[in-house]
Amino acid sequence: MISLNEWLIKKKCINLFPTNDIASWIKYTEYNFIYDKLSLAQLQNLDCAPLPIIPAIFPVIVKPIINLYGMSRGFKKINNYEEFILIKDNGYFWEKYLDGDQYNYDIVIENGKIIDSFCYHSVPLNEGTFLYHQYIEKKIPPNIVNLIENLMENYTGFMNIELIDGYIIEAHLRLNGDFFIFNETMVDNFINFIKNGLYTFQDIKPMTFFPIFIKNISTDYTPVFNILNKWNINYKIDNIYSETQGDIYKRLLYFICTDHKLGLSIQKEIYLYCL
């Protein structure tokens, strides 16, 4: 499996458009306000406030106002006042806990107008981790389209948003960091769009992204690789020491499967016997 960054290096287009939030913040100075999650929540009238202002209702989600590293760094679900007063982090805020389904969208924008999008249904686990991300055909809700197009006037490029219960909880001026549904043809399409303003609509085959998260980085995880090799599953190992990893859980690896039920079975086997 090849990352978008690796594809762009291979195509000699590494500086054509950013693939991480740090580079996106620097490149798109006119639009990097989108990374301010507190302002984004306020804009949508989602109950929120900076710490140490105390919420009237629990549970809430606490996280950094701006996080350019990703991987849900600093994400915490706070269930009551007693837990809340223990948090002493600067630069954090809280927002209403949303318990609906989460959908992530990769979006193609031309001159402030959305011309294409790709949806992933994300099923959460603990502390900002996920069971899986499954590609599905689902349009962006009209109110979210209007919000994005009002905010991103004249912007041309890519955007990734995370939606729960009709609210944008996070937005990024880049494509999904794991880039698992797109092949080389689609990479060429993205390059042609940015270089020449030409975009071709393409079909995406169904597939699911299965992450494997760990707590103990000193454990020997050879049995995990043995299970994946037994099933002849293609996987990509993450750098568990990267500063972009989460505070509690680290993503050891991920694998992709076009058979959703088989992927769930393999993931269950890994978590049941190895972790």
Labelled PLM ranges:
Residues 162-166:
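A glycine-rich phosphate-binding loop feature that marks nucleotide/adenosyl-phosphate handling sites
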Residues 1-13, 171-184, 233-249, 254-257, ...:
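An exposure/low-complexity boundary signal
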Residues 1-42, 258-275:
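ATP-binding N-terminal substructure of ATP-dependent carboxylate-amine bond-forming enzymes
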Residues 47-49, 89-90, 152-156, 231-236:
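Short secondary-structure junctions
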Residues 16-147:
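Active-site nucleotide/adenylate-binding loops and adjacent lid/helix of ATP-dependent enzymes
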Residues 101-102, 107-155, 167-213:
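ATP-dependent carboxylate/phosphate-activation module, predominantly the ATP-grasp catalytic core
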Residues 44, 191-275:
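Peripheral (often C-terminal) accessory segments that flank ATP-dependent C-N-forming ligase machineries
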